[in-house]
């Protein structure tokens, strides 16, 4: 780590450049996409980066990130605390200036922070501008300071609210619903970024807590970038055990790099500048690739490796199967945009070159076994590249890849403008025939795919080109294939729609196609050209009514609508009907879904009892005993036994023991379950049902009358009556639909539903490797961990 001098970090360190007015008008310039979730998570990362900068400066070793139940997020560190003194030019506290003025921060003069990732006042002020509210708590100079902001404006000046021996800053914010289409945070996306930061910053303990469901993870990962590479390769097969590692400093800049090759065919390189990831690389990555190629080629020539193998190696060959983490730290880094996806600082290139060249030369000379394995992998890649080039030449001579000859099975459209054209990739000739007859020939092209295409995750490039179905697909798309040939500007369709059956084979074919696009044509995914069709799962008839229903949920909702027609409940002289009946029924069905999902963790009988019980309180042994008594009273003692137990640090739990088919089943009600959205749904439902329907209640459906002593009984009767008059057909294959049905449900742009495929890079890479790679154990573990929560699986 670059040495940090402990200069004064006070109010006069803060420089002011401009205000916040522009941010809400153009949020994408500062935070990224506000609709797809990336900008929302970037809000957290901006605040988190400031805490990490305190760690880089040597003042912080503990950071806590919390997703609160109200969808706000807080980031707390034990650093120096934001300056609280009065800013000499602004006439108000420096903390308020940092939070309300764009480009106000302590990172412009290189004194308060020599190395920083974010500009503490660019990021955090943008977060303030795009939030409904922000609270800032500062522990500094023996005092606790507090200030609250509403939509970027100070509600009242910073004030001292008490004495404290703590140090640090806590920022809590609620993202603005006007700016962001959705403020649901993903625990996994935040955990991914925090894991990166933990590897990159040894000695910093970062904790992530989700109050919505009680999930918690602690990150105190060691090993630096080498440990990071080992983690990235955990689901792959490394070719050599020893990981290459390099570290060096020059002119106030540092370079740290780790590399390890595996048996896959994909390159996986993560680049960071002052802990900030660069998705699009930049000058540090360019320098790394150049020095790698030059250094390894020198070793190969000196040892006549390529000469003996009779091949010529290139830079791409050296990066096949490479997993690498490159982390650079430098003062005043320059990026191509505020989102910092690409580094443009030219001064880092020579430092990367010098550090990597010397370290890699030494590594290859001092570790002959590793060098032999790595160069052997490179030679194999060079042979495969040459074979692929020959395969391309053969296919080009046949007219396959230059657009002169289109596949015979492609039913092309009349439209020549790619932006107005769409290609349906359809499973099987039967469905392909229906799609051809049902389509709009003007702009819809159809390509039937026979059987399952090749799994490109396991296949070399030349083998992929030899696959007839893959070659047909490449030809139809018209954009070529491979780094030398692929040109997305030549793509013939800007909507590529995958349309497969709603069964296991259909899901497999869809996954194979997505693997192909992700690995071979990622540009098409990033540009938003790949879609998944959503054909209906059901066709339902009720009297003269006929409906296509997308999935199980839509079927249940339609059935509920039919069940509630001309229905009412009369209990204790009160009539429940119309909107009140519908809202309560929807709430109850939601609770049933929650019970079904949560029964993996908590006994189902007890979950059902919660719908008739008071909210559970486990804050003390007395309250826990009350909850045990109430729940036990709602259950038959032969069904389940409940008891209070005390856990670590006095935490209260309820243990549930139940005998089922001769087996003893044990589950627990834990404090974290009571903080979950699932339990909130159950308590809301219990409140809605309380006193609603009692003994002697009557249910009326049209002219019929039924006895119903509970709301659940009434709803069961209504759903049963509705189902009697309904006939449901489940579509397993697209071929079961005639052309007219396929058009009106799945292909008509005015009514169809399409899912646009978007990918979060690092998570996607891991999932594809797990599901489509060679290793059986990670795939088995993934299936076992997710089988119970998977939906729409056909037996």
Swiss-Prot record:
Signal sequence extent: none
Where does this polypeptide localize?
Answer: Cytoplasm
At the top level, the lineage of the source is: Bacteria
Residues holding Mg(2+) 1: 427, 501
Indicate the family of this protein: Belongs to the type II topoisomerase GyrB family.
Record's keyword annotation contains Nucleotide-binding: yes
Q: Kindly state the subunit structure of this protein.
A: Heterotetramer, composed of two GyrA and two GyrB chains. In the heterotetramer, GyrA contains the active site tyrosine that forms a transient covalent intermediate with DNA, while GyrB binds cofactors and catalyzes ATP hydrolysis.
Q: Where is this site: Interaction with DNA?
A: 452, 455
Q: What is known about what this protein does? A: A type II topoisomerase that negatively supercoils closed circular double-stranded (ds) DNA in an ATP-dependent manner to modulate DNA topology and maintain chromosomes in an underwound state. Negative supercoiling favors strand separation, and DNA replication, transcription, recombination and repair, all of which involve strand separation. Also able to catalyze the interconversion of other topological isomers of dsDNA rings, including catenanes and knotted rings. Type II topoisomerases break and join 2 DNA strands simultaneously in an ATP-dependent manner.
Which residue stretches, if any, does this entry annotate as coiled coil?
none
Provide a GO biological process annotation.
DNA-templated DNA replication
* Miscellaneous remark of the record: Few gyrases are as efficient as E.coli at forming negative supercoils. Not all organisms have 2 type II topoisomerases; in organisms with a single type II topoisomerase this enzyme also has to decatenate newly replicated chromosomes.
Q: Which InterPro entries match?
A: DNA_gyrase_B_C (IPR002288), GyrB (IPR011557), GyrB_hook (IPR049353), GyrB_insert (IPR041423), HATPase_C_sf (IPR036890), Ribosomal_Su5_D2-typ_SF (IPR020568), Ribsml_uS5_D2-typ_fold_subgr (IPR014721), Topo_IIA (IPR001241)
Per the UniProt record, the site (Probably responsible for antibiotic resistance) maps to: 429
Q: Where does Mg(2+) 2 bind?
A: 501, 503
The Toprim domain sits at 421-536
Q: Which key words are in the record?
A: Antibiotic resistance, ATP-binding, Cytoplasm, DNA-binding, Isomerase, Magnesium, Metal-binding, Nucleotide-binding, Topoisomerase
Example GO molecular function:
DNA topoisomerase type II (double strand cut, ATP-hydrolyzing) activity
Question: Reaction catalysed?
Answer: ATP-dependent breakage, passage and rejoining of double-stranded DNA
Report the protein name in the record.
Antibiotic resistant DNA gyrase subunit B
Reported EC number(s) for this entry are 5.6.2.2
Q: Give the organism, scientific name.
A: Neisseria gonorrhoeae
GO CC term, one of those recorded: cytoplasm
This protein's cofactor list reads: Mg(2+); Mn(2+); Ca(2+)
UniProt cofactor note = Binds two Mg(2+) per subunit. The magnesium ions form salt bridges with both the protein and the DNA. Can also accept other divalent metal cations, such as Mn(2+) or Ca(2+).
């Amino acid at each position: 780590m670059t040495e940090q001098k402990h200069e004064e970090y006070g109010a006069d360190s803060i420089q002011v450049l401009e205000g916040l007015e522009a941010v809400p008008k153009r949020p994408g310039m500062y935070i990224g996409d506000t609709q797809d979730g990336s900008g929302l998570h970037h809000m957290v990362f901006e605040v988190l980066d400031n805490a990490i900068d305190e760690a880089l400066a040597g003042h912080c070793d503990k950071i806590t990130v919390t997703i609160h139940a109200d969808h706000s997020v807080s980031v707390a560190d034990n650093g120096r605390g934001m300056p609280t003194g009065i800013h000499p030019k602004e006439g108000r506290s420096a903390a308020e200036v940092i939070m309300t003025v764009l480009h106000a921060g302590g990172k412009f003069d290189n004194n308060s922070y020599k190395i920083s990732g974010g500009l503490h006042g660019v990021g955090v002020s943008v977060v303030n501008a795009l939030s409904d509210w922000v609270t800032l708590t500062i522990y500094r100079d023996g005092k606790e300071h507090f200030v609250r902001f509403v939509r970027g404006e100070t509600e009242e000046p910073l004030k001292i609210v008490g004495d404290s021996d703590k140090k640090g800053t806590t920022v809590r914010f609620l993202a603005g619903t006007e700016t962001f289409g959705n403020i649901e945070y993903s625990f996994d996306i935040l955990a991914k970024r925090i894991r990166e930061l933990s590897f990159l910053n040894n000695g910093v303990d970062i904790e992530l807590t989700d109050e919505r469901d009680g999930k918690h993870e602690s990150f105190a990962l060691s090993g630096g970038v080498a440990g990071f590479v080992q983690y990235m390769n955990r689901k792959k097969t490394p070719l050599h055990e020893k990981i290459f590692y390099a570290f060096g400093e020059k002119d106030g800049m540092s370079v740290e790099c780790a590399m390890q090759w595996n048996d896959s065919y994909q390159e996986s390189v993560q680049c960071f500048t002052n802990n900030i990831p660069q998705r699009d690389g930049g000058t540090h990555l360019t320098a790394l690739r150049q020095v790698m190629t030059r250094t390894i080629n020198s070793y190969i020539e000196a040892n006549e490796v390529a000469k003996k193998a009779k091949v010529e190696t290139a830079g791409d060959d050296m990066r096949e199967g490479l997993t690498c983490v490159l982390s650079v730290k430098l003062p005043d880094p320059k990026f191509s945009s505020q989102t910092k996806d690409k580094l443009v600082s030219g001064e880092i290139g020579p430092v990367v070159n010098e550090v990597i060249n010397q370290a890699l030369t030494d590594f290859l000379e001092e570790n002959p076994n590793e060098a032999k394995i790595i160069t052997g992998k490179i030679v194999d890649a060079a042979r495969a590249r040459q074979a692929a080039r020959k395969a391309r030449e053969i296919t080009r001579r046949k007219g396959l890849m230059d657009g002169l000859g289109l596949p015979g099975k492609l039913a092309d459209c009349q439209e020549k403008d790619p932006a107005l054209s769409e290609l349906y990739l359809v499973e099987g000739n039967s469905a392909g025939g229906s799609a051809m007859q049902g389509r709009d020939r003007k702009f819809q092209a159809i390509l039937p795919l026979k059987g399952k295409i090749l799994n490109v995750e396991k296949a070399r490039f030349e083998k992929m080109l030899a696959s007839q179905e893959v070659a047909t697909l490449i030809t139809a798309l018209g954009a070529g294939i491979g780094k030398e040939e692929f040109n997305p500007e030549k793509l013939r369709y800007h909507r590529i729609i995958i349309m497969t059956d709603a069964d296991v084979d259909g899901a497999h074919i869809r996954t194979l196609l997505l693997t192909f696009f992700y690995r071979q044509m990622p540009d098409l995914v990033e540009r938003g050209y790949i879609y998944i069709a959503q054909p209906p799962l059901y066709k339902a008839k009720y009297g003269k009514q006929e409906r296509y229903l997308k999935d199980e949920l839509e079927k249940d909702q339609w059935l509920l609508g039919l069940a509630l027609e001309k229905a009412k409940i009369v209990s204790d002289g009160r009539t429940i009907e119309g909107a009140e009946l519908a809202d309560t029924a929807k709430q109850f069905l939601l609770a049933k879904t929650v019970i079904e999902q949560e029964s993996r963790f908590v006994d189902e009988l007890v979950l059902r009892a919660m719908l008739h019980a008071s909210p559970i309180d486990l804050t003390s042994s007395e309250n826990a005993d009350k909850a045990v008594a109430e729940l036990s009273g709602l259950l038959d003692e032969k069904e389940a036994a409940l008891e209070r137990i005390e856990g670590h640090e006095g935490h209260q739990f309820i243990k549930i023991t139940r005998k089922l088919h001769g087996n003893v089943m044990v589950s627990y009600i834990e404090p974290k379950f009571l903080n979950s959205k699932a339990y909130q749904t159950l308590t809301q439902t219990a409140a809605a049902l309380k006193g609603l329907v009692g003994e002697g209640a009557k249910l009326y459906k049209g002219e019929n009358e039924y006895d119903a002593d509970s709301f659940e009984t009434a709803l069961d009767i209504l759903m049963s009556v509705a189902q009697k008059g309904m006939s449901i057909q489940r579509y397993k294959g697209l071929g079961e639909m005639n052309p007219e049905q396929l058009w009106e449900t799945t292909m008509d742009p005015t009514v169809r539903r399409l899912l646009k495929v978007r990918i979060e890079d690092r998570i996607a890479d891991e999932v594809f490797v797990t599901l489509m790679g060679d290793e059986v154990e990670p795939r088995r573990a993934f299936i076992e961990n997710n089988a119970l929560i998977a939906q729409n699986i056909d037996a």
